[in-house]
UniProtKB/Swiss-Prot annotation:
<keyword id="KW-0723">Serine/threonine-protein kinase</keyword>
<keyword id="KW-0547">Nucleotide-binding</keyword>
<feature type="modified residue" description="Phosphothreonine">
    <location>
        <position position="455"/>
    </location>
</feature>
<dbReference type="InterPro" id="IPR001245">
    <property type="entry name" value="Ser-Thr/Tyr_kinase_cat_dom"/>
</dbReference>
<feature type="region of interest" description="Disordered">
    <location>
        <begin position="609"/>
        <end position="629"/>
    </location>
</feature>
<feature type="glycosylation site" description="N-linked (GlcNAc...) asparagine">
    <location>
        <position position="92"/>
    </location>
</feature>
<dbReference type="GO" id="GO:0005886">
    <property type="term" value="C:plasma membrane"/>
</dbReference>
<keyword id="KW-1003">Cell membrane</keyword>
<feature type="modified residue" description="Phosphotyrosine">
    <location>
        <position position="463"/>
    </location>
</feature>
<dbReference type="InterPro" id="IPR000719">
    <property type="entry name" value="Prot_kinase_dom"/>
</dbReference>
<keyword id="KW-0812">Transmembrane</keyword>
<keyword id="KW-0067">ATP-binding</keyword>
<feature type="glycosylation site" description="N-linked (GlcNAc...) asparagine">
    <location>
        <position position="123"/>
    </location>
</feature>
<dbReference type="InterPro" id="IPR017441">
    <property type="entry name" value="Protein_kinase_ATP_BS"/>
</dbReference>
<keyword id="KW-1133">Transmembrane helix</keyword>
<dbReference type="GO" id="GO:0005524">
    <property type="term" value="F:ATP binding"/>
</dbReference>
<keyword id="KW-0675">Receptor</keyword>
Length: 629
């Protein structure tokens, strides 16, 4: 009977494969050199609809093409975070020997996965002092970078290159090489398009699905397939039930052996389905020095996070779920499923996990060394406490909003957006973390009905009142984060007066009464710098829109990103701001400018509903962590 069940399952698999054969023929995972690849990569002998990046595997070292019929680059390494490091060997050889002549004809395709830097190749007669440069030996010219707009660049020619090409050395001297990395981020609907037999194509900055298996003429084929599967499933259930009755006594006698087999199959299931490494409990116990208190990074609502170093030398953050949390397995599986389907530079990377039948449930993340945004804004007795300049705060807001917009485009709601879940790397780049409460929102529904969960001070009042979770719930929480960034105040502070314990209530009250200056942190230069005053007031206005009680009045995260980038453009145009030293150069204020002038055209609700209503939920995430996932 077991053989019959296996054969029936295999038959169903063949039926499903045949239904999509016309769309997926020739598209499969493959090995190229020493690396394994899958979509969005494809081999030269595969159809172009199989991916976005073509790989040539005919030589020992694979090569990649960034655009159709474009130049071939050598692949140096591939990481689990969808980052691929490549090199232009001919140009690199030229640069290594000190020749820069090939740079003049160098160009890269327009790509959202590359950060570009502008180099200036200048005649030695136009030599620049005080800025980093790399000599172009014997060619009568030198190579410079970090030249500001206010410097004379006559006798120089600009060259666009990847940021990673310039490697600082001693003093002002730098090395230039032709090695760079691509961090590839695709929305979830692009992967679904590929899995449905379609071709995901890039059109400007968006992606379009062509030829997915959803045409009306497939109706009868899908009907026949559905009937076949339905009948076969019923037959399989009957056979499995009979098999269970016959072998019940055998299972009781050999329970311990079956338990070991189940653990093995669970590990294999995790490796195959989620495609992430499985760590043993002993390895992570050793990596964290037996979960030493000295390695403690933070305590959260669902677990404790420890610093560790695994066998291959990588620094990691190990999340140890609380044993008393009856939902820990659900949160464990939920976070793995979500993080393995997402790839974005501003989302924390999941390196692996233990088996779900392990002694303890442990999740292994990349280690983010610079703490959380909350640490830097108002943390006490933390190693990361320090002042964030206005330009840094605006950049943090944009990167966080971009990550949330990417989640929403992939039909995922974070549900626990807060400053303790926004981590900062060495360069103060954002990494959004903690997906234990995240939910998948099907594209054909407007909301999901679920009991409110989250952190007090950040929870959408409409979600709390109506039990309707939408992507606008994340928008509300992000509005609180925006207010924290401009005010340097925590989301909840019981030392404030009762009506202003929640920062959202305080912000709405100040903005409606044209008292934004009382809300904004004066250390940012609000009183002395016109540009800072204008931009912080504009962010306050955007936060006010995000905090509307009626979620239909709130913007989408995509609109929030657009508005924040527009504000950043104002910063770049402002002549009163010195970006290198973060110093303020005051100028006289125009007579028609001020927070009242900026906000006077906003249509504020007369009496917004306060979100300070007390409520109790055992499922909430307490705001107690300095490093919380």
């Amino acid at each position: 009977m077991e053989t019959v069940s296996v054969l029936l399952f295999f038959f169903l698999f063949l039926l499903a494969a045949e239904a999509r054969s016309t769309k997926r023929t020739g598209c499969k995972d493959f090995t190229c050199g020493e690396h394994d690849f899958k979509f969005p990569f494809f081999r030269t002998d595969m159809p172009s609809r199989c991916g976005l990046f073509k790989l040539n595997c005919s030589a020992n070292i694979p090569e990649i093409q960034l655009e159709k019929d474009g130049k071939w680059y050598t692949v140096k390494s591939v990481s689990q975070a969808n980052t691929i490091t490549i090199i232009d060997p001919r140009l690199n050889q030229s640069l290594t020997t000190g020749g820069c002549s090939d740079l003049s004809s160098f160009s890269l395709p327009d790509s959202p996965w590359l950060k570009l830097n502008t180099l200036y190749k200048c005649n030695n007669s136009s030599r620049k002092n005080g800025f980093s440069y790399a000599n172009c030996r014997g060619e009568g010219s030198s190579l410079y970078y970090n030249l500001g707009d206010d410097h004379d660049v006559s006798g120089c020619s600009p060259i666009k290159t990847p940021e990673s090409w310039v490697t600082p050395k001693n003093g002002n001297l730098s090395d230039v090489n032709a090695t760079f990395s691509l961090h590839i981020e695709l929305p979830g609907n692009c992967f679904r398009c590929h899995n449905n037999g379609g071709e995901c194509t890039k059109v400007k900055n968006n992606y379009r699905c062509v030829g997915a298996n959803t045409e009306p003429n497939n109706y009868h084929a899908e009907m026949r397939l559905g009937l076949g599967i339905g009948g076969s499933v019923i037959l399989i259930i009957i056979l499995v039930a009979l098999f269970a009755v016959i072998h019940r006594n055998y299972r009781r006698k050999d329970g311990s052996e079956l338990s070991r087999d189940n653990s093995k199959s669970d590990v294999e299931f995790s490796q195959v389905f989620f495609k992430i490494p499985i760590f043993s409990y002993k390895e992570l116990q050793a990596a964290t020095d037996n979960f030493s208190k000295d390695r403690l990074l933070g305590d959260g609502g669902f677990g404790t996070v420890y610093y560790g170093k695994v066998r291959d030398g990588r620094e990691v953050a190990v999340k140890r779920l609380y044993e008393h949390n009856y939902r820990r397995l659900e949160q464990f599986m939920n976070e793995i499923e979500i993080l393995t389907r997402l790839h974005h530079k501003n989302l924390v990377s999941l390196y692996g996990c233990t088996s779900r039948r392990s002694r303890e449930l442990l999740l292994v993340y990349e280690f983010i060394p610079n703490g959380t945004v909350a640490d830097h804004l108002y943390g006490e007795n933390t190693p990361h406490q320090g002042f964030l300049t206005w330009s840094m705060r605006l950049s943090i807001a944009i990167e966080t909003a971009s990550a949330l917009a990417y989640l929403h485009a992939s039909d995922i709601i974070h549900r626990d957006v807060k400053t303790t879940n926004i981590l900062l790397d060495r360069n103060f780049g954002v990494k959004v973390a903690d997906f234990g409460l995240s939910r998948l929102l099907p594209s054909d529904v407007t909301h999901v009905s679920t009991a409110p969960q989250g952190t007090p001070g950040y929870v959408d009042p409409e979600y709390h009142r109506c039990y309707h979770l939408t992507d606008k719930s994340d928008v509300y929480s992000f509005g609180v984060v925006l207010v924290e960034l401009i005010s340097s105040k925590p989301a909840v502070d019981i030392s404030r007066c009762k009506s202003e314990i929640n920062l959202s209530s305080l912000a709405i009250n100040k903005i409606q009464n044209h008292a934004t200056h009382e809300l904004i942190d004066q250390n940012l230069g609000y009183a002395t710098n016109e540009g800072v005053r204008k931009m912080t007031t504009m962010v306050a206005e955007l936060a006010f829109q995000c905090l509307q009680q009626d979620n239909t009045m709130r913007p989408t995260m995509e609109q929030v990103v657009h508005e924040l980038k527009g504000i950043q453009n104002e910063e770049q145009k402002c002549p009163t701001y010195d970006y290198r030293e973060e110093t303020i150069i005051p100028h006289p204020s125009p007579p028609d400018w001020g927070e009242a002038a900026l906000l006077k055209n906003m249509k504020f609700p007369r009496s917004p509903v306060s979100v300070t209503d007390q409520w109790t939920s055992k499922s909430t995430t307490p705001n107690t962590s300095a490093y919380e996932f």
